[in-house]
Amino acid sequence: IRTFSVPGDVAFVNEFVRLAELMPPDGLIIDVRDNGGGLIWAGERLLQTLTPKTIEPERLQFINTALTDQLAKANGAGASIDLSKWRPSISRAGETGASFSCSFPITDPARCNDIGQRYHGPVVLITNARCYSTTDIFAAGFQDHDIGEVLGIDNNTGAGGANVWEHGLLLQLAGAPLKALPKNAGMRVAIRRTLRVGKQAGTELEDLGVVPDVEHKMTRRDLLENNVDLIEKAASILAGQPRFRLDATASKAGSKLRVKLTTQNIDRVDFEIDSRPQRSDDIADGSRNVDLPTGLAHGTLSLKGYK
C-alpha cells in the first residue's frame, strides 16, 4: 500500500477487499514501507477486513491552549469538522491543569466494523522508518488488535502518528489571531496527537511510533533481487501462524435461507440476520449446509466463527 491519500475511503476499502479475496488463503504480506499516510479512516477501516475481532479505532487528543479552546468552541455539532466531543475537557483545563484534552476517535467505531473480516489467512505487515501519519495509525491498530506480526526493516516507524492540518484549514476554522501566510506560502501542523488502544492503551503514538515484533536488516540480495530475503522472512512468519477458513454462500431453498459453509480450524459458527442472532452451531472442518428458519430469507446475513 503506497499511500492512504485517496479521495474517499469507500472505493479504497472496496478495492482492497476485492484484491484480498483474490489472494491465496495461506497468507498475506502487506507492505506499507515509505507510505507517508493520508486519510485516517481509509487506513483504520481496512483493519476489520483482516481479523474477526471488533476494531477499536485509535484515539486523538488536543493540547489544551487558548487557541484550541477557541477552535473547539467555534466548531461544534453541525460544523464541517465537529470538535464538540473535545470541547468540555479543553474548557476545563484552566480548572484541572490538564495539559491535554480527553481523547476520542476520529473514525466512527461503527464504520470500523461495518464490513467484517474478508481475508481469513494469516497476515504480516512490513514497515520502515518512513511510515508516517495514517500509516503509523494503521500499523498501531494492526499491532494493538493482534492481527499479525509487524515485520520492520527499521526498529520503528516514523513516529509521526498525528492528525495533520493545513494552515489554510486552521485559518478557516479558527480565524483570528491566525492570518494568511505571505506569498501564498503554506504549512502543516500536527493538531491532534494519537493514543494507542489495546494492550498499549493510552500510549502516545507520536514520537514513540510502532516498534516491530520482528526486525529484518536489508541484505545485498534484498537490494539486488527485489526484496527476496525480506519476503522469505515474511513467509517464514506466516508459516508459523494458524490457518482459519470461513467461506459461505447463501441461496434460497423454498422459503428458507440455505447457507453452504466451508470451515477450517473453527469450532463454532453463529448466524445473524440484520444483527439478530438466529442459531449457533458446533462444527468440524469441512463443508456442510445450514438451513435458517422459515421467513428469514431476507436481510443481511452475518457469520461469526469461534475457536
Where are these regions (language model features)?
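C-terminal "post-core" interaction segments
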Residues: 1-307
